[in-house]
């Protein structure tokens, strides 16, 4: 009983120390501004059944404008949800599957490897999915978020943002229209240093 609880508590502490050491190592060895970019609902839903729930053309235009010419890092499921690798960007897939191969994309099996593959790009973008965002959030410097002002049912979620560590740098609200049924905002958060 008590011994098992103690062992579990010690293991949690060791895991937390390992994570913090990994963060320090990554931030020391890679002088990059790591940027998360996502579209999320009010309840942090990213999508359902490996698809986006909404289609907001202005969000897609913004995504293309911001990520074009940069390395984009994503999980396998995100890559497989797209018809092909995104043009004009260095596509990097982070996966645990050592046998995985993909056309027009680089494969990484760890965060440091994904960042190394981003080369000399000082602004690699993390484009999803939920698990990948959770891995990169502790080392991210900026978040480019499209907040869809509605709740949705979904099975992929963006990690909750600890607002004590981030500052809202800019905000642009967009109202629904005939072609666009959702109110949404473009939000840029920067990490408090």
Protein language model regions, located:
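Enzymes that bind and transform nitrogen-containing heteroaromatic metabolites
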Residues: 25-193
């Amino acid at each position: 009983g008590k011994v098992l609880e103690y062992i579990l508590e010690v293991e949690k502490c060791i895991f937390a120390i390992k994570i913090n050491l990994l963060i320090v190592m990554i931030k020391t060895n890679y002088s990059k501004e790591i940027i998360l970019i996502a579209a999320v609902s009010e309840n942090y839903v990213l999508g359902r059944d490996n698809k986006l729930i909404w289609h907001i053309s202005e969000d897609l235009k913004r995504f293309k404008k911001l990520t074009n010419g940069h390395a984009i890092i994503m999980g396998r499921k995100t890559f497989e949800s797209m018809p092909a690798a995104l043009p004009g960007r260095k596509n990097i897939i982070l996966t645990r599957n050592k046998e995985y191969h993909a056309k027009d994309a680089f494969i990484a099996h760890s965060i440091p490897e994904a960042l190394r593959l981003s080369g000399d790009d000082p602004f690699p973008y993390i484009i999803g999915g939920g698990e990948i965002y959770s891995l990169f959030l502790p080392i991210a410097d900026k978040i480019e978020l499209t907040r869809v002002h509605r709740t949705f049912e979904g099975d992929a979620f963006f990690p909750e943002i600890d607002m004590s560590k981030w500052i809202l740098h800019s905000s642009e609200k967009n109202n629904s229209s005939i072609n666009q049924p959702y109110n949404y905002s473009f939000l840029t958060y920067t990490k408090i240093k």
